[in-house]
């Protein structure tokens, strides 16, 4: 199962599969539309080691980084960790570019300068230029990101941990979706900042 879903559901699917003498793997991916087209996805796999080994030739056709994370559900927990990092990172990217614009800096020059330093990230490198062009075409839809953030918050609640950064990111994305931006890419978050003026 290469969708992004609940880690608990992944465990339930594996139990049902094993009753029938089958294996089930949860193998969500990261890398967006570009990673998928170029077979450079990061694939995070949960499930039995033997099943992962059997599926490895298929995974290698789609991805560059294939990581067996442990038992069923661990692929999904890893994907949630990925989404949590992206949520806060995307807020940081948007706030940095918005701050630069409002201060009168040449935002393209700022993007080049900070991409080469400690602030550099895949979000900044891939989505920063799209933000500057006001290109909100989806590599990953806001509506799907909202779903993922809710799954992460549900699992965090089960673990009895608080993720205030993720809660804030979800709030901003939900506000954007309510204004009709749910079918845009996650870089569309910058519009939340534009609308504050």
Report each predicted region and the residues it spans.
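Rossmann-fold dinucleotide-binding core
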Residues: 4-83, 87
